């Protein structure tokens, strides 16, 4: 199990990302716009830099929903490799069968 503080920190990051998503998107649209003047782009870039670092989605880390483990994460299932294996062996994931050849 991952430390509770790390899992909570990640939840807080996700919350911050959601809170600032619209603002970040608007500023990025101005920065990438060909119609905006150089001054407008520069000001938008400064505003984007003033936003909290944790509002950037790339700072997030995928974690297992059950254990909070950050490594060995399978996006399709939202589980770490250990819990994915357990769930597969118990038949809890429909359509997933152990490979055999």
Curated annotation (Swiss-Prot):
It comes from the Bacteria. InterPro entries: Ribosomal_uS14, Ribosomal_uS14_bac/plastid. One of its GO terms (cellular component) is small ribosomal subunit. The keyword Membrane does not apply. GO terms for biological process: translation. Keywords: Ribonucleoprotein, Ribosomal protein, RNA-binding, rRNA-binding. One of its GO terms (molecular function) is structural constituent of ribosome. Belongs to the universal ribosomal protein uS14 family. Binds 16S rRNA, required for the assembly of 30S particles and may also be responsible for determining the conformation of the 16S rRNA at the A site. Part of the 30S ribosomal subunit. Contacts proteins S3 and S10. This is Small ribosomal subunit protein uS14. It comes from Alkalilimnicola ehrlichii (strain ATCC BAA-1101 / DSM 17681 / MLHE-1).
């Amino acid at each position: 199990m991952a430390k509770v503080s790390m899992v909570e920190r990640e939840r807080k990051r996700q919350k911050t990302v959601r809170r600032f998503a619209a603002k970040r998107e608007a500023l990025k649209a101005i920065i990438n716009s060909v119609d905006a003047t150089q001054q407008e782009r520069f000001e938008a870039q400064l505003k984007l830099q003033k936003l909290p670092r944790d509002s950037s989605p790339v700072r997030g880390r995928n974690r297992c929903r059950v254990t909070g483990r950050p490594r060995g994460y399978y996006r399709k299932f939202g589980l770490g490799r250990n819990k994915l294996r357990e769930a597969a062996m118990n038949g809890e994931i429909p359509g997933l069968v152990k490979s055999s050849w």
